[in-house]
C-alpha cells in the first residue's frame, strides 16, 4: 500500500451520529398504576406535574394518578376534551409550561395532546394508556385531526410508560383489536420502506426494521390468544405497541410502522370522517397492500378476523366507492413517503382490490 493511501486512511474521520430517545422505564402489568409514584421518584423529573386526561379517562384512571401523586407533587390537571384540537394543544402547552413534567392518562387523543404539549414546552412525558388502540402510546409522533384529514406532528417520546393491564383489559375489546391491527400493519409498512430504499435510495435502519417486523410477527402468530377483556391479551398487545414505538424512535421517523396502509387510513378519515378506528383502517389497508406486494394477504386477513378486527370497508360503515376513492387518494397523503400505492394504481385496479377484500 502506498504512503499516500496510508495517510488517507489515517485522516478519514467517522462522522456519523444519531440521537435516539427511548423510554427509561416501561412498567406493564396488573395494578401497576400504583407504581407511578415510584416511577416518578426514580426519574426525578421535578416537584410539579401536569396530568392530562379526558372526561372518561379521568374517572377510569386519571383521578387515581392524581391521588397517588398529590402528597409528593404540586399536581395540576388538564382536561383534553372534544373541540378544536389545536386550541386544546395550545391550552395544554400553557399548563405544561409551569410544570416540571407531564403525564398523559387516556387514549389516543389524550396521549397525543400530552405528547405534543410536552414536546413544544421541552418537558418530559410519561405515558399512562387506558386503552391499547394504537402504537402512539410509546412513539415520537402524534396525530392531530384537521378539516383536511389527520396530520402527523413531532411529539415527545415517553421517558416512561406505565400500562396497567387491568385498566386496559376493561376497555372495549374493539380498542384492543384496533391496536393489534395497527401492529400487524407493520408488516406492510416495512415492505414499503424496503421498496422505497431499493427504488428511491431512502435510508433504511436494519435495527428498526427488524424490531418492527418481529413485533408484527408476534401478534400475527398469536392471534388466537387475543381475547376480550383478558389481561394476558392486554399484556401481549401493550408490549407490542411499546416495541413498535421504540422502533420508530430508533428510526427517527414513523417509517417502521407507517406505509401505504396508513396513507389509505388517513385518506379514509378525510373522505369518511369518524368511520372506523385508526388501527382498524390500517388493518384493512394492510390486506390490500400485502396483496400488492405479493405477500400473504390472506394470512393478514385471517389473523385480523381471529382478533376481531374488521377486514372490509363495509364492516366500518364505509361504502366501496369511498374505499376506492381512498386508495386512489392515498398517494396525495404525505407524497414524500413512497409506498406501493404510488406505483401507478388505476381506478380499475383499485376497484378489484376492494372486491378482493370480500373473498372467502
UniProtKB/Swiss-Prot annotation:
Binds 1 zinc ion per subunit. The keyword Nuclease does not apply. It comes from the Archaea. Pathway: Membrane lipid metabolism; glycerophospholipid metabolism. The keyword Secreted does not apply. It is an enzyme of class 1 (oxidoreductase). Coiled coil: none annotated. SUPFAM superfamilies: Dehydroquinate synthase-like. One of its GO terms (biological process) is glycerophospholipid metabolic process. GO terms for cellular component: cytoplasm. Keywords: Cytoplasm, Lipid biosynthesis, Lipid metabolism, Metal-binding, NAD, NADP, Oxidoreductase, Phospholipid biosynthesis, Phospholipid metabolism, Zinc. HAMAP family: G1P_dehydrogenase_A. Belongs to the glycerol-1-phosphate dehydrogenase family. NCBIfam families: PRK00843.1. This is Glycerol-1-phosphate dehydrogenase [NAD(P)+]. The gene is egsA.
Amino acid at each position: 500500500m502506498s504512503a499516500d493511501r496510508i495517510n488517507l486512511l489515517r485522516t478519514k474521520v467517522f462522522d456519523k451520529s444519531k440521537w435516539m430517545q427511548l423510554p427509561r422505564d416501561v412498567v406493564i402489568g396488573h395494578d401497576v398504576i400504583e407504581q407511578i409514584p415510584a416511577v416518578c421518584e426514580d426519574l426525578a423529573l421535578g416537584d410539579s406535574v401536569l396530568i392530562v386526561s379526558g372526561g372518561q379517562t379521568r374517572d377510569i384512571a386519571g383521578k387515581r394518578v392524581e391521588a397517588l401523586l398529590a402528597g409528593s407533587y404540586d399536581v395540576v390537571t388538564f382536561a383534553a376534551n372534544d373541540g378544536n384540537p389545536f386550541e386544546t394543544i395550545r391550552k395544554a402547552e400553557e399548563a405544561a409550561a409551569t410544570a416540571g413534567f407531564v403525564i398523559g392518562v387516556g387514549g389516543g387523543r389524550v396521549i397525543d395532546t400530552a405528547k405534543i404539549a410536552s414536546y413544544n414546552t421541552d418537558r418530559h412525558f410519561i405515558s399512562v394508556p387506558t386503552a391499547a388502540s394504537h402504537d402512539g402510546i410509546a412513539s415520537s409522533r402524534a396525530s392531530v385531526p384537521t378539516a383536511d384529514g389527520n396530520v402527523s406532528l413531532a411529539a415527545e417520546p415517553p421517558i416512561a410508560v406505565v400500562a396497567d393491564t387491568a385498566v386496559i383489559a376493561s376497555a372495549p375489546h374493539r380498542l384492543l383489536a384496533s391496536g393489534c391491527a395497527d401492529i400487524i400493519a407493520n408488516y406492510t409498512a416495512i415492505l414499503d420502506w424496503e421498496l422505497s430504499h431499493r427504488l428511491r435510495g431512502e435510508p433504511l435502519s436494519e435495527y428498526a426494521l427488524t424490531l418492527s417486523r418481529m413485533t408484527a410477527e408476534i401478534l400475527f402468530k398469536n392471534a388466537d390468544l387475543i381475547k376480550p377483556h383478558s389481561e394476558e391479551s392486554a399484556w401481549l398487545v401493550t408490549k407490542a405497541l411499546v416495541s413498535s414505538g421504540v422502533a420508530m424512535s430508533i428510526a427517527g421517523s414513523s417509517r417502521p410502522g407507517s406505509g401505504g396502509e396508513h396513507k389509505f387510513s388517513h385518506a379514509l378519515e378525510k373522505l369518511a370522517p369518524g368511520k372506523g378506528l385508526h388501527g382498524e383502517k390500517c388493518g384493512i389497508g394492510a390486506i390490500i397492500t400485502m396483496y400488492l406486494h405479493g405477500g400473504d394477504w390472506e394470512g393478514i386477513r385471517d389473523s385480523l378476523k381471529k382478533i376481531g378486527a374488521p377486514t372490509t370497508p363495509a364492516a366500518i360503515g364505509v361504502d366501496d366507492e369511498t374505499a376506492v376513492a381512498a386508495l386512489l387518494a392515498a398517494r396525495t397523503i404525505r407524497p414524500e413517503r413512497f409506498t406501493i400505492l404510488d406505483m401507478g394504481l388505476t381506478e380499475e385496479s383499485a376497484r378489484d382490490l376492494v372486491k378482493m377484500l370480500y373473498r372467502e
